[in-house]
């Protein structure tokens, strides 16, 4: 019941995905051969959300892995959990996308997309009641961004009523891997606004800060960053996989978090974040969790929620705790910081409680917020985009693959519209609405 199909694309997506499956296997007591070696029936009760049971009692992840070059996939395959995936579900090309969105979306990626869709279709047909898809990718490169968005739009055509959730790694403000990141990211956002239902916005710099400041790691690796992401990913779906007192699923999440269809870019956070050494020395309380998960330093993307307002938010608690306490704490946050919530959406914080905590913790919580301050991310990418596009820098790489400059202009204006929409709702107040109504009534009287 309620299966989720996981898709990972490009180098970044595959590395996050590999880490994610380590976390999920750990939670469900699956070892690296796919055999169950856990100690609780609860681990098996809804294991079919993420796993297919194959012959001989092996559990195979419902995962599709794609890339345009074989390198990252080989390292996933030879990694600790590489043998657990279905070999047919590795779909890869040889040529690579070379950080070029057009190659991923129009040329190289388009040649490979049908074989990816076949695998997706095969996995979807294996599902009893498919709830939706979760896609891991980055927006700065070529494959994850170009081919990732192509796949999302194709899946959208074929499964229009299923949820589409993405974990998208945005280019960081100060750290840049490639010079054309702003192009790739803008073209991708243009697609994600239209075709995805929910986007969890991540970025490396914010993750580095968390590792460095909060976790006290001297030299964080991508592995550490990906571990943070996968903790959040696991938290988002824990209610589907374990029994809870207050359930949520992808669709409930969307209904509670998205007031206007285009504004579906969320900030995510996770608590407790404590350095590996100090974990066993403290007992966590619900107030501590709540305080940490609402903390701006805890957000996994480089936007500061204090610069905007929350349209909506959702908190998923895991562990044995009283729902009364959870409700009190959430109410407390809203009352104390009421200026950071828009007043024209009452009760805009949803909470859910799942009884089973992640391994090694007594309780944990995942935070998802729809804040207008996310526009900082888009604004920053847009500025970098404009700076290059004004000079038509690097454009020949894209036009050479058959793209038109018009497409860039469209993507740019779509992104600017998005920023403007967030700004509009940030400034909106409850009185605006009433004034409008007042005017209309007067007009009617005059008429």
Curated annotation (Swiss-Prot):
Residues 429-447 have a biased composition (Acidic residues). One of its GO terms (molecular function) is structural constituent of cytoskeleton. It is found in: Cytoplasm, Cytoskeleton. Its cofactor is Mg(2+). CDD domains: beta_tubulin. Tubulin is the major constituent of microtubules, a cylinder consisting of laterally associated linear protofilaments composed of alpha- and beta-tubulin heterodimers. Microtubules grow by the addition of GTP-tubulin dimers to the microtubule end, where a stabilizing cap forms. Below the cap, tubulin dimers are in GDP-bound state, owing to GTPase activity of alpha-tubulin. Mg(2+) binds at residue 69. GO terms for biological process: microtubule cytoskeleton organization; mitotic cell cycle. Dimer of alpha and beta chains. A typical microtubule is a hollow water-filled tube with an outer diameter of 25 nm and an inner diameter of 15 nM. Alpha-beta heterodimers associate head-to-tail to form protofilaments running lengthwise along the microtubule wall with the beta-tubulin subunit facing the microtubule plus end conferring a structural polarity. Microtubules usually have 13 protofilaments but different protofilament numbers can be found in some organisms and specialized cells. Belongs to the tubulin family. It comes from Oryza sativa subsp. japonica. PANTHER family: TUBULIN. This is Tubulin beta-5 chain. Residues 421-447 are annotated as: Disordered. GO terms for cellular component: cytoplasm; microtubule. Induction: By gibberellin and brassinolide. Down-regulated by abscisic acid (ABA). Expressed in roots, leaf sheaths, and suspension cultured cells. GTP binds at residues 11, 69, 138, 142-144, 204, 226. Keywords: Cytoplasm, Cytoskeleton, GTP-binding, Magnesium, Metal-binding, Microtubule, Nucleotide-binding.
């Amino acid at each position: 019941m309620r299966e989720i199909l996981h898709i990972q694309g490009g180098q970044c997506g595959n590395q996050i995905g590999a880490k994610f499956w380590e976390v999920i296997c750990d939670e469900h007591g699956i070892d690296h051969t796919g055999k169950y070696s856990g100690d609780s029936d609860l681990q098996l009760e809804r294991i079919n959300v993420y796993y297919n049971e194959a012959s001989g009692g092996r559990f195979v992840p419902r995962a599709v892995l794609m890339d345009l070059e074989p390198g990252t996939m080989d390292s996933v395959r030879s990694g600790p959990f590489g043998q657990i995936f279905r070999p047919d579900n590795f779909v890869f090309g040889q040529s690579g996308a070379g950080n070029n969105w057009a190659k991923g979306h129009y040329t190289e990626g388009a040649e490979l997309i049908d074989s990816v869709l076949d695998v997706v279709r095969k996995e979807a047909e294996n599902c009893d009641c498919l709830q939706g898809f979760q896609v891991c990718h980055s927006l700065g490169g070529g494959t994850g961004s170009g081919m990732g968005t192509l796949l999302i739009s194709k899946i959208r055509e074929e499964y229009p009523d299923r949820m589409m959730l993405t974990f998208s790694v945005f280019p960081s403000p100060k750290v840049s891997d490639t010079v054309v990141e702003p192009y790739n990211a803008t073209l991708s956002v243009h697609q994600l606004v239209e075709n995805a239902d929910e986007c969890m916005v991540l970025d490396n710099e914010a993750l580095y800060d968390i590792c460095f400041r909060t976790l006290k790691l001297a030299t964080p690796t991508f592995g550490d960053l990906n571990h943070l992401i996968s903790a959040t990913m696991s938290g988002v779906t824990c209610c589907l996989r374990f029994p809870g007192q207050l359930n949520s699923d992808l669709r409930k999440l969307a209904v509670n978090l998205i007031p206007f269809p285009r504004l579906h870019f969320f900030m995510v956070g996770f608590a407790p974040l404590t350095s590996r050494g100090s974990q066993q020395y403290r007992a966590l309380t619900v107030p501590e969790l709540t305080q940490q998960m609402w903390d701006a330093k805890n957000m996994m993307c480089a936007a500061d929620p204090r610069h905007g307002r929350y349209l909506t938010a959702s908190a998923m608690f895991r562990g044995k705790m009283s729902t009364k306490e959870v409700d009190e704490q959430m109410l407390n946050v809203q009352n104390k910081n009421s200026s950071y919530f828009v007043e024209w959406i009452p009760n805009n914080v949803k909470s859910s409680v799942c009884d089973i905590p992640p391994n090694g913790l007594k309780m944990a919580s995942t935070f998802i917020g729809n804040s207008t301050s996310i526009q900082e991310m888009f604004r920053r990418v847009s500025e970098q985009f404009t700076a290059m596009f004004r000079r038509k820098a690097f454009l020949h790489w894209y036009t050479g693959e058959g793209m038109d400059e018009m497409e860039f202009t469209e993507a740019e204006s779509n992104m600017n519209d998005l920023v403007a929409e967030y700004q509009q709702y940030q400034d909106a107040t409850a009185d605006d609405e009433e004034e409008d109504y007042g005017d209309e009534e007067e007009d009617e009287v005059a008429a």
